[in-house]
């Protein structure tokens, strides 16, 4: 008799899969388990598809359609002869094999023809609504200014009131200019070959990369970027003009969209945006080569390569990741994807003063070296002046260039003010994390690159998980400014799900720690989970009780705090489990090689806890990260969305985002609480981790505080000296720190005294003969 079965007879246990241990089942629902999941975040049930698979024929009546259907049925039935004699098979079975192959080929051709046929408008709307995709045609052409009549006899109060009414009217007019569109969705990746005619090698690389189901952003973006004419080919060119309808200018813009569109995509983190812009860029290069009759298959032949696409990313890590993904996707196609490095030169055109600028550049190099040369070196330089010209790096041949803003801008602006390099052959400019690139920190650099791309057929695409309204306005203003010279292509915006919210497949926790010491204690409890929960909810759920398993990321506000936290935690993991090597730190002050080494170790699971700043908050893809710890409160709602998006990539469930906040953070934490509440509402969660009483109790954040927090972070953590030691990350008491500082001071003082005594002794020996002792 099994005593355990007897004692547990009255309890209900979860059914176990045969042959699978319970521990494995408990750990399977986390990102690092490697379980294959559906990458699509949304698949709502919005009703049955429209009845009938046949398209409506406008040129015929309903009776004719029914007659045609009857004829089709008769033809299908006539193909089968139920009373025909049984055919004799060949001895080798060749006839049956040939017939089976013909039937298979005919079926395949019919399937491809079916996939190449546009989907009906109603079905398009149903699919887009099911995946929560919303397209908007943004007005790029300048609208005629509205005539506002103002009376000179109005009083000041009435004038102010009239100005408010005019502003509201202009806002309503701007809203009405934005028309919804319903392009063709990408139902499966097999459509890319049949309907959108991408390169066969590119389709094979997609299959080898295990791309099976398109995500929401891929489902919505790829048709518009690959073949916008086909994507907008259904009735009304995709414009829903039955409600407000009738914007003839917008209709005309969409009818000319076959040459390409400008695109703005706002999609959740980890939803496949990189593939969405790399695939059209590579296919565009191959398509233009085919039109010119160039194969470009031999990568050693540099004459085939011309810079046609530029991808700009805000950080080195993200740029390196994009370049690696591009090389995998372009393998065997002859398209060269290059990551720009310091000192690299790319193909660019200059003005007529190119020769003059080179001479001036040589003079600059020579003038810099003159101060460090001796007289003999100067004479030798004069005799060998022709051979002392600075050696320039060879021009790198690339089809697609991946870069950070400053690297490319330094190359374009290198030289004197009379030389301006241009990139006239670039036809595609891609801004990944566009809200950061067009913010104040990178705006000047990004606009310098944008203005250098002078191709009249230039198409610009903007990608991010968050997009503020002022960034959208800035994009529209720049596109309108360029529309003065030539007709502007249409700008289509795609929003996946709710704007500026975190991914719905992760859970969120807000933990109040009161002080900095409480943060350190809470983080150590995550490293060594206790039997109790650390959530603030009054009702705990199984998700709240789930411990955070490594690997995970820890985000802090400054480099100084990242280094201090690493010193505190590096010995918390036992030596038997790897010890200090399991905890690493990464920030922008580290050399590029050291940062790359840390990233490699983290991807290889040699590092379990990676402490970092916001340098890793955007774009970097770690598939197996189980969670994110916001040790310091993020500076904005967008920063929280991107930090939390490092887990739960590609639809993986089980990720956890933990945020610590102290007494000093209470005035600023409501931004994070609002994002958590919206994200859980979007996911359809029953009970939110952010209780309503907490949202009501937290104070609202003013615009001034939001701006200061976004630019500089929480004031008390900017430096230890400014906070009078309150923001110090340490587990030592004040007495221990004082004793340690006194010991260090005593050692330093002893060293100084020894050095002074030695110097004094050396000085006394330098004199002449000893003259004896004075009386």
Curated annotation (Swiss-Prot):
Residues 26-40 have a biased composition (Polar residues). Gene3D superfamilies: P-loop containing nucleotide triphosphate hydrolases (3.40.50.300). Keywords: ATP-binding, Helicase, Hydrolase, Nucleotide-binding, Nucleus, Ribosome biogenesis, RNA-binding, rRNA processing. Signal peptide: none annotated. Pfam families: DEAD (PF00270), Helicase_C (PF00271). Residues 68-79, 359-379, 762-775 have a biased composition (Acidic residues). A motif (DEAD box) lies at residues 432-435. One of its GO terms (molecular function) is ATP binding. SMART domains: DEXDc, HELICc. The Q motif is unique to and characteristic of the DEAD box family of RNA helicases and controls ATP binding and hydrolysis. PANTHER family: RNA HELICASE (PTHR24031). ATP-dependent RNA helicase involved in 40S ribosomal subunit biogenesis. Required for the processing and cleavage of 35S pre-rRNA at sites A0, A1, and A2, leading to mature 18S rRNA. Interacts with the U3 snoRNA and is associated with the 90S and 40S pre-ribosomes. Belongs to the DEAD box helicase family. DDX52/ROK1 subfamily. This is ATP-dependent RNA helicase ROK1. It comes from Pyricularia oryzae (strain 70-15 / ATCC MYA-4617 / FGSC 8958) (Rice blast fungus).
């Amino acid at each position: 008799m099994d005593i355990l079965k007897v004692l547990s007879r009255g309890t209900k246990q979860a059914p176990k899969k045969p042959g699978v241990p319970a521990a494995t089942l408990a750990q399977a629902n986390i990102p690092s388990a490697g379980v294959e999941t559906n990458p699509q975040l949304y698949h709502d049930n919005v009703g049955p598809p429209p009845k009938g698979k046949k398209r409506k024929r406008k040129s015929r009546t309903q009776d004719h359609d029914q007659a045609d259907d009857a004829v089709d049925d008769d033809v299908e039935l006539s193909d089968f002869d139920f009373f025909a004699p049984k055919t004799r098979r060949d001895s080798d079975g060749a006839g049956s094999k040939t017939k089976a192959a013909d039937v298979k080929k005919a079926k395949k051709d019919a399937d491809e023809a079916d996939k190449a046929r546009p989907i009906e408008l109603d079905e398009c709307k149903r699919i887009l609504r099911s995946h929560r995709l919303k397209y908007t045609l943004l007005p790029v052409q300048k609208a005629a200014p509205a005539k506002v009549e103002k009376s000179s006899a109005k009083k000041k109060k009435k004038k102010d009131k009239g100005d408010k009414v005019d502003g509201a009217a202009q806002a309503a007019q701007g809203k009405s200019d934005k028309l919804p569109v319903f392009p063709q969705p990408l139902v499966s990746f097999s459509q890319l070959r049949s309907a959108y005619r991408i390169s066969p090698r590119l389709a094979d690389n997609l299959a080898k990369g295990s791309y099976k189901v398109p995500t929401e952003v891929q489902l919505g973006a790829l048709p518009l970027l690959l073949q916008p004419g086909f994507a907008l080919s259904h009735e009304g060119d995709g414009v829903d003009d039955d409600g407000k309808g009738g914007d003839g200018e917008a209709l005309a813009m969409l009818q000319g969209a076959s040459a390409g569109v400008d695109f703005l995509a706002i999609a959740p983190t980890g939803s496949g945006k990189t593939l969405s812009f790399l695939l059209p860029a590579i296919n565009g290069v191959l398509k233009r080569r085919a039109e010119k009759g160039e194969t470009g298959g031999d990568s050693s032949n540099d004459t085939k390569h011309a810079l046609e696409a530029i991808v700009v990313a805000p950080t080195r890590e993200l740029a390196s990741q994009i370049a690696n993904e591009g090389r995998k996707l372009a393998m065997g196609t002859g398209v060269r994807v290059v990551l720009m490095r310091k000192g690299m030169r790319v193909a660019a055109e200059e003005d007529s003063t190119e020769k003059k600028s080179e001479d001036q550049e040589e003079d600059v190099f020579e003038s810099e070296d003159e101060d460090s040369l001796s007289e003999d070196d100067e004479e030798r330089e004069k005799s060998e002046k022709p051979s002392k010209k600075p050696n320039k790096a060879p021009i790198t041949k690339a089809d697609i260039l991946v870069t950070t803003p400053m690297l490319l801008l330094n190359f374009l602006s290198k030289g004197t003010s009379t030389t301006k390099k241009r990139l006239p052959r670039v036809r595609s400019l891609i801004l990944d994390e566009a809200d950061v690139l067009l913010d104040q920190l990178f705006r000047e650099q990004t606009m310098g690159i944008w203005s250098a791309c002078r191709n009249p057929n230039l198409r610009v695409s903007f990608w991010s998980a968050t997009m503020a309204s002022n960034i959208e306005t800035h994009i529209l203003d720049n596109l309108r400014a360029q529309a003065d010279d030539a007709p502007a292509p249409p700008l289509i915006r795609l929003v996946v799900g709710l704007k500026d919210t975190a991914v719905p497949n992760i859970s969120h926790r807000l933990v109040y720690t009161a002080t900095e010491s409480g943060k350190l204690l809470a983080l150590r409890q995550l490293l060594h989970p206790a039997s109790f929960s650390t959530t603030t909810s009054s009702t705990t759920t199984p998700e709240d009780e789930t411990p955070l398993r490594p690997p995970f990321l820890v985000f802090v506000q400054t480099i100084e705090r990242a280094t201090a936290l690493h010193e505190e935690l590096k010995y918390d993991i036992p030596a038997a489990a790897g010890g200090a090597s399991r905890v690493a730190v990464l920030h922008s002050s580290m050399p590029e090689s050291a940062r790359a080494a840390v990233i490699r170790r983290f991807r290889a699971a040699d590092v379990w806890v990676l402490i970092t700043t916001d340098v890793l908050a955007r774009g970097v893809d770690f598939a197996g990260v189980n969670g994110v710890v916001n040790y310091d409160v993020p500076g904005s709602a967008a920063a929280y969305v991107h930090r939390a998006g490092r887990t739960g990539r590609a639809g993986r469930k089980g990720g956890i985002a933990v945020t610590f906040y102290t007494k000093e953070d209470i005035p600023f934490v409501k931004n994070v609480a609002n994002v958590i509440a919206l994200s859980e509402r979007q996911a359809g969660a029953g009970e939110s981790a952010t209780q309503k009483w907490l949202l009501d109790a937290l104070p609202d954040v003013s615009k001034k505080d939001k701006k200061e927090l976004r630019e500089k972070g929480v004031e008390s953590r900017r430096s230890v000296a400014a906070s009078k030691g309150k923001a110090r990350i340490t587990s030592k008491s004040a007495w221990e720190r004082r004793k340690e500082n006194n010991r260090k001071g005593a050692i330093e003082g002893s060293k100084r005294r020894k050095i002074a005594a030695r110097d004094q002794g050396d000085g006394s020996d330098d004199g002449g003969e000893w003259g004896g002792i004075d009386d």
